[in-house]
UniProtKB/Swiss-Prot annotation:
One of its GO terms (biological process) is endosperm development. GO terms for cellular component: polar nucleus. Its main location: nucleus. Residues 1-44, 63-135, 160-266, 346-402 are annotated as: Disordered. PANTHER family: PROTEIN HAIKU1 (PTHR33783:SF1). Interacts with WRKY10. Interacts with MPK6. Modulates seed size by negatively regulating the cellularization of syncytial endosperm. May function by binding and modulating the activity of WRKY10 transcription factor. Residues 103-113, 257-266, 371-380 have a biased composition (Pro residues). It comes from Arabidopsis thaliana (Mouse-ear cress). The gene is IKU1. This is Protein HAIKU1.
Length: 402
């Protein structure tokens, strides 16, 4: 009971009267303020009116002498920094000197596409790039033009070769050693007929076969194409993608172009075998044999005219039936609608005989009879999974060597 009485001054005032200072405290506070007013005015802090430049020196003077001694040290350190030779050695050259040669070099871009003509000494000496120019080798000269990348150089070469397919293209392809960095052109030098032709994209995608050099004297080549004899391939270089297909009657039709391999084939009239049918090797990889085009409609198997060892591009087994499965034993296909490459049944003419000349290929002449349709062993569809050429396993009239 004694504790609440002792702590009354510490408790909450429950009466609710206003809290004021006691009169004794107010009298002592007034006396202390009146007595201390005079010395407070005398002991006011000093005010310094200084400028920005003198602020550091005044602060150092007020704080003490050690900071004043450290003041001349930073200028000494700054004076030693420009004398550092390592920083001067690794300092890069100014960017203005690198961007300056980019103005005259785009006009010299066509000669720059060849490594032999890449060096341009008249344009390089005016710029004092002594540290970079001696290190630039034969192929590093391409990087002198910082605004051009190898891809842009290659695209400019393609545009120049496509646009100027006349004397300019022949001038740029006298020898294939001038284009070592172009993909796909490493395979072209051993094809004799391609030196005079302009480079086209998609031309490097065709497989080159040993019989490719016989294009210039093929009988169907001189009849079908309207180009002169020394240039047997301008017809093919007009289109960068699929090539014109050889009709069964011989002449090329420009409106008949092959679809990409493996896509929907287009119907081709199969009335008579092409004169190229009796040739030892095919003319182009994308112009298959006439009998094979009945089924595939232009599926690009390179060596089907000569029964070469090359397999079908999509077959994992032996070669499918070169004549196409629709031509089983009768001239008319029993499954015209189920065959991928035949949109309508087409009878073969009587002169489409399996002669000895037509059977000559890379594996030698066959022994098939020339009178009537033969009865050869069945096609691989009977013993293996179905070949991509058809849906039904049917014997092939041309497989008499197997």
């Amino acid at each position: 009971m004694d504790r609440p009485r002792q702590n009354d001054h510490l408790g909450v005032n429950r009466i609710g009267k206003n809290i004021r200072k006691s009169p004794l405290h107010q009298s002592t506070f007034a006396a202390s303020t009146s007595n201390g007013a005079a010395p407070r005015l005398q002991t006011q802090p000093q005010v310094y009116n200084i400028s920005k430049n003198d602020f550091r020196s005044i602060v150092q003077q007020l704080t003490g002498s050690p900071s004043r001694e450290s003041l001349p040290r930073p200028p000494q350190n700054n004076s030693l920094r420009p004398q550092n030779t390592r920083l001067q050695r690794i300092r890069p050259s100014p960017l203005t000197q690198l961007n300056r040669p980019a103005v005259p070099l785009p006009s010299m871009a066509p000669p720059q596409s060849h490594p032999q003509f890449a060096r341009q000494p008249p344009h390089q000496p005016p710029f004092p790039q002594t540290t970079q120019q001696p290190m630039m080798g034969h192929r590093d000269q391409f990087w002198s033009n910082t605004a051009e990348s190898p891809v842009s150089e290659y695209m400019r070469y393609l545009q120049s070769s496509l646009g100027d397919s006349g004397p300019n293209a022949n001038q740029m392809q006298p020898g294939h050693e001038q284009r070592p960095y172009i993909p796909g052109h490493e395979q072209r030098p051993y094809v004799p007929g391609n030196e005079q032709q302009p480079y086209m994209p998609g031309n490097e995608q065709r497989p080159y076969i040993p019989g490719h050099e016989q294009r210039s004297y093929m009988p169907a080549q001189s009849q079908s194409q309207s180009q002169p004899q020394p240039q047997p391939q301008p017809q093919q270089h007009m289109m960068p993608g699929p090539q014109p297909r050889m009709n069964m009657q011989g002449p090329l039709q420009p409106n008949q172009y092959l679809p990409p391999p493996g896509l929907v084939p287009s119907p081709v009239p199969h009335n008579l075998p092409s004169p190229r049918f009796n040739a030892p090797v095919p003319v182009t990889p994308t112009q298959p044999s006439p009998m094979f085009s009945q089924m595939y409609g232009g599926f690009p198997s390179p060596r089907y005219n000569g029964f070469g060892p090359l397999q079908s591009p999509t077959s994992q087994f032996l070669q499918p039936s070169p004549t196409g499965y629709p031509n089983m034993f009768s001239p008319r296909s029993p499954y015209p609608l189920l065959s991928p490459g035949v949109q309508y049944p087409q009878p073969l003419t009587p002169n489409f005989s399996f002669s000895q000349i037509a059977q000559q290929g890379s594996l030698g002449p066959g022994a098939g009879p020339s009178q009537g349709p033969p009865q050869p062993p069945p096609s691989p569809g009977l013993m293996f999974p179905l070949s991509p050429s058809g849906f039904f396993p049917m014997p092939s009239p041309r497989w008499n060597d197997y």
